[in-house]
UniProtKB/Swiss-Prot annotation:
Its main location: cytoplasm. The modification Tele-methylhistidine is found at residue 74. GO terms for cellular component: actin cytoskeleton; cytoplasm; plasma membrane. The gene is Act57B. One of its GO terms (biological process) is mitotic cytokinesis. This is Actin-57B. PANTHER family: ACTIN. Disulfide bonds: none annotated. In Drosophila there are 6 closely related actin genes. It comes from Drosophila melanogaster.
Length: 376
């Protein structure tokens, strides 16, 4: 197979959104929700061409009549049949490519179970007949995208957050920490506190509206108590939002109370540490000699790190935890929503990477276990 002309595909499967495109591009061509929807009711209109399942944006637009399911929970694929539908949709409908003609780079969550990597490998070679594939860890790709090989990545998406310390390009598995607190939990929490305000959001379709409110209006306060006082004393922090039916709702302290849960998970009734402590704990699990390099390269990635104010707050919180002499730098690139994908695009287009692919021949010879030997 001549690698000169065939572009590799890069597919970043997140819990909330799937990002897909071609290696060498600077942004994904396709970004769509990782959703599979099935009709709640029997079709009555003859000849309407009703399907038994819908994927991505189409599922999203027909959400009123569908039950929506996310095949990826907390960053890890739990429903393989639906996942196959998502990949099929990615190749044939979004990118419009024949998967058997392109090498494909997939991404995985840190600490992904071994059986899962094998299953991904098997599906790519056996269902989609890929000529070659590779599985890369999401956080490592984000670090590449920021132009570094050493640093600690806080990757927070829709389903899960991880802190991943990376030294000279290798993730340090003993120091990776996972926090099951991410965008979807914040959306649920916003639904809850808006309900307390008298607005009712309950269905899966309404959850998507709340997600939009969250993405457009929420921010992280530098000082939570002070912000609460400001919100109580004036209406300066209030914003209005128009619902799809034309009703206008007003949202005040919910704007920063919602993402505050990242720093105070007790808001959600969770006993875990906030993201700032998780980053600190992760650094403390690393060798004392490399901590200085990690503190100076704290890289944020993923959609849940997109809140205005999050980097400044992180800087403040880590500064109060870390030794006073240490230099702390938070890197929050503007494109961090897609930095995993961008890192994959960079990696798959490097000439030095070309010998890293797992080829169909190697797979046929060794079986799915090959993924553990070639992708690390």
């Amino acid at each position: 197979m001549c690698d000169d002309e065939v572009a590799a595909l890069v597919v970043d499967n997140g819990s909330g959104m799937c990002k897909a495109g071609f290696a060498g591009d600077d942004a994904p061509r396709a970004v769509f929700p990782s959703i599979v929807g099935r009709p709640r009711h029997q079709g009555v209109m003859v000849g309407m061409g009703q399907k038994d399942s819908y994927v991505g944006d189409e599922a999203q637009s027909k959400r009123g009549i569908l039950t929506l399911k996310y095949p990826i929970e907390h960053g890890i694929i739990t429903n393989w049949d639906d996942m196959e539908k998502i990949w099929h949709h990615t190749f044939y409908n979004e990118l419009r490519v024949a998967p058997e003609e392109h090498p494909v780079l997939l991404t995985e969550a840190p600490l992904n179970p071994k059986a899962n990597r094998e299953k991904m490998t098997q599906i790519m070679f056996e269902t989609f007949n890929s000529p070659a594939m590779y599985v890369a860890i999401q956080a490592v790709l984000s670090l590449y995208a920021s132009g570094r090989t050493t640093g600690i990545v806080l990757d927070s998406g829709d389903g899960v957050s991880h802190t991943v310390p990376i030294y000279e390009g290798y993730a340090l598995p003993h120091a990776i920490l996972r926090l099951d607190l991410a965008g979807r939990d914040l959306t649920d929490y916003l639904m809850k506190i808006l309900t307390e305000r008298g607005y009712s959001f309950t269905t899966t379709a309404e959850r998507e509206i709340v997600r939009d409110i969250k993405e457009k209006l929420c921010y992280v306060a530098l000082d939570f108590e002070q912000e609460m006082a400001t919100a109580a004393a004036s209406t300066s922090l209030e914003k209005s939002y128009e619902l799809p039916d034309g009703q206008v709702i007003t949202i005040g302290n919910e704007r920063f109370r919602c993402p505050e849960s990242l720093f105070q998970p007790s808001f959600l009734g969770m006993e875990s540490c906030g993201i700032h402590e998780t980053v600190y704990n992760s650094i403390m699990k690393c060798d004392v000699d490399i901590r200085k390099d990690l503190y100076a390269n704290i890289v944020m990635s993923g959609g849940t790190t997109m809140y205005p104010g999050i980097a400044d707050r992180m800087q403040k919180e880590i500064t109060s935890l870390a030794p006073s002499t240490i230099k702390i730098k938070i890197i929050a690139p503007p494109e961090r929503k897609y930095s995993v994908w961008i890192g994959g695009s960079i990696l798959a287009s490097l000439s030095t990477f070309q010998q890293m692919w797992i080829s169909k021949e190697e797979y046929d010879e060794s079986g799915p276990g090959i993924v553990h030997r070639k992708c690390f």
